UniProtKB/Swiss-Prot annotation:
Residues 565-579 have a biased composition (Polar residues). It comes from Lupinus angustifolius. The keyword Disulfide bond applies. Residues 136-147, 338-350 have a biased composition (Basic and acidic residues). Disulfide bonds join C32-C65, C108-C406. Hexamer; each subunit is composed of an acidic and a basic chain derived from a single precursor and linked by a disulfide bond. Component of globulins complexes which accumulate in seeds. Keywords: Allergen, Disulfide bond, Seed storage protein, Signal, Storage protein. PROSITE patterns: 11S_SEED_STORAGE. This is Conglutin alpha 3. Residues 113-147, 199-240, 283-402, 565-585 are annotated as: Disordered. Residues 1-23 form the signal peptide. Residues 309-320 have a biased composition (Acidic residues). SUPFAM superfamilies: RmlC-like cupins (SSF51182).
């Protein structure tokens, strides 16, 4: 009797598990069965020493439908957003200001190195003394950004941002929580390397606390429970480690470990660097060099060039006449090329020797000599042997690992007027960034569309064929209408600066700017998101089909298909006539 009972019990458990899984799938599907869309504003606000962090409630039905979360960071001048990473990719839109972005990509080398001369210059600027025992700094590439840029942050990659401008730096972050890179649940998480930042998504923290209360055994020791309560609020990833273990693992003293974990300091998401941030950067290096060279702009370089020419002429005069006679019809020429200034401020030169050989017909043959030999002598050892083998072996294709990971392009200015994809002088302009213009977006299945509508300009009805879209208003105000598959209007209201609106896939949407214009960015969950303008669809359908489908005359069908612009940017009829009259006058 035991075997049938166990069999039936096992079958019941399997059915319960299957129904639970199906229920989760249906819940995920039903999240996009939205009868009404809402304009979303930030729900949480964290004020730090160097700025403000705002987040949207990730449990909002619209955001759960799109599978994304949003953050907004306002960084004051000299503000530093502490290093952190997430388990999903991010797109950052720079709404205002300028600054620097640092990313520590795992497995990539530190390509920015500090020379001794540049170190002393930096220390002179700060009024510090150089210490010979301190090791010269090196780090990975520093990227600079400005208003209108979009930045792509890979998952699990620590990054930091710094505002070196004179105004506030405002950045809006999209976090793709349902990305395949995220192997955890879709609740947003951010892992900070430093500080004691506050929880950015308190709704997820409440859910975790409720689960822990249900899962906590009743007989748990009081000491262990007290220890867990003491660790609450320590939100950087180093705080949870044992100090002695961390000291041995990182080979540092206990005082340094204490500062890394800083259990008592309340340093939040954004700090202020009072003396300014000093890192290795060609942009900042050139600015320092220009300041130092104001006293003698070009005199020193001219003197060095003149002395070098005199030395070359002296060497040619001292050369034996027999060697010059032996050359006969051969003419030797030294070409010196300056390639700018190095990181340490010193000039470096590369010399190549070109030999011009005159044949019987007066033709010249030019060949470069000694360049490879000089490189071999300078490098020596393994490098020279490897270079020699590469020259002897036939050309082969590179694997592309370093080019695609360590030197990937992560920035593009989507708001630049010169790169507009669609433009109407009286209606506005549209620019897109996808995996064709910014290849790294193809890794994460994301893209963006920038829309700047002029006064009363219209972005005609259209829909996103293969992506959800999330609109963030940068400036101005506009009227937005969204219609679902049942033909019902799920949103028909004004959107203003700082608001979000989710437009699900294939929902038809239209925009019209107000008197002050309408500027927004639309993040999309496909690296090659495609829009289908309604007017273009009508033009692709035969006239007879439209006439019978809508009960229209052929004249009406002709007006429907061919009146107006070919692109979805439309100017109101009255404004278009006024514009034409002004142009004629």
């Amino acid at each position: 009797m035991a075997n049938p009972f166990l069999l039936s019990l096992s079958l019941c458990l399997v059915l319960l598990y299957t129904s639970a899984c199906l229920g989760e799938g249906l819940d995920r599907f039903n999240e996009c069965q939205l009868d009404r869309l809402n304009a979303l504003e930030p729900d949480n606000r964290i004020e730090s020493e160097g700025g403000v962090t705002e987040t949207w409630n990730s449990n909002k039905p619209e955001l759960r439908c799109a599978g994304v979360a949003f953050e907004k960071h306002t960084i004051e001048p000299k503000g530093l957003h502490l290093p952190s990473y997430t388990n999903y990719p991010q797109i950052i839109m720079i709404v205002q200001g300028e600054g620097a972005l640092g990313i520590s990509v795992p497995g990539c080398t530190e390509t920015f190195e500090e020379a001794q001369q540049s170190q002393s210059r930096q220390e002179r600027r700060r009024g510090q003394r150089s210490q010979s025992q301190e090791q010269e700094d090196s780090h990975q590439k520093i990227r600079h950004f400005r208003e209108g840029d979009i930045l792509v942050i890979p998952p699990g990659t620590p990054y930091w941002t710094y505002n070196y401008g004179d105004e506030q730096l405002v950045a809006i972050n999209l976090l793709d929580t349902t990305s395949l890179s995220n192997q955890l649940d879709p609740n947003p998480r951010r892992f900070y390397l430093a500080g004691n930042p506050e929880e950015e998504y308190p709704e997820t923290q409440q859910q975790r606390q409720q689960r822990q209360q249900h899962q906590r055994p009743s007989g748990r020791r009081h000491g262990q429970h007290q220890k867990e309560e003491e660790q609450e609020g320590k939100n950087n990833i180093l705080s949870g480690f044992d100090p002695q273990f961390l000291s041995q693992a990182l080979n540092i003293d206990e005082d340094t470990v204490h500062k890394l974990q800083n259990p008592n300091e309340r340093i939040k998401q954004i700090i202020r660097v009072e003396e300014g941030l000093g890192v290795i950067s060609p942009k900042w290096q050139e600015q320092e060099e220009e300041e130092e060279e104001k006293e003698e702009p070009r005199q020193r370089r001219r003197r060095e060039r003149r002395e070098e020419r005199e030395e070359e002429e002296k060497e040619e005069e001292d050369e034996p006449r027999e060697s010059r006679r032996h050359r006969g019809g051969h003419e030797e020429e030294e070409v010196e090329e300056e390639r700018g200034r190095g990181r340490g401020g010193s000039e470096w030169k590369r010399t190549t020797r070109r030999r011009h050989t005159r044949g019987d017909e007066g033709q010249e043959e030019e060949e470069t000599t000694t360049t490879t030999e000089e490189r071999r002598r300078r490098r020596g050892g393994r490098g020279s042997r490897q270079e020699e083998e590469e020259e002897q072996s036939p050309p082969r294709s590179r694997n592309g690992l370093e080019e695609t990971i360590c030197t990937a392009i992560l920035r593009e200015n989507i708001a630049d007027p010169t790169r507009a994809d669609l433009y109407n002088p009286t209606a506005g302009r549209i620019s897109t960034a996808n995996s064709l213009t910014l290849p790294i977006l193809g890794w994460f299945q994301l893209s963006a569309e920038y829309v700047n509508l002029y006064r009363n300009g219209i972005y005609a009805p259209h829909w996103n064929i293969n992506a959800n879209s999330v609109i963030y208003v940068i400036r101005g105000r506009g009227r937005v209408q969204v219609v679902n598959s049942q033909g019902n209007s799920v949103f028909n209201d004004d959107l203003r600066r700082g608001q979000l609106l989710v437009v699900p896939q294939n929902f038809v949407v239209a925009h019209q700017a107000g008197d002050e214009g309408f500027e927004f960015i639309a993040f999309k969950t496909n690296d090659q998101a495609t829009t289908s303008p309604l007017k273009q669809v009508f033009r692709g359908i035969p006239a007879e089909v439209l006439a019978n489908a809508f009960r229209l005359s052929l004249n009406q069908v002709s007006e429907l298909k061919y009146n107006g612009n070919h692109n979805p940017l439309v100017t109101p009829q009255s404004q278009s006539q006024d514009h034409n009259l002004v142009k004629v006058a």
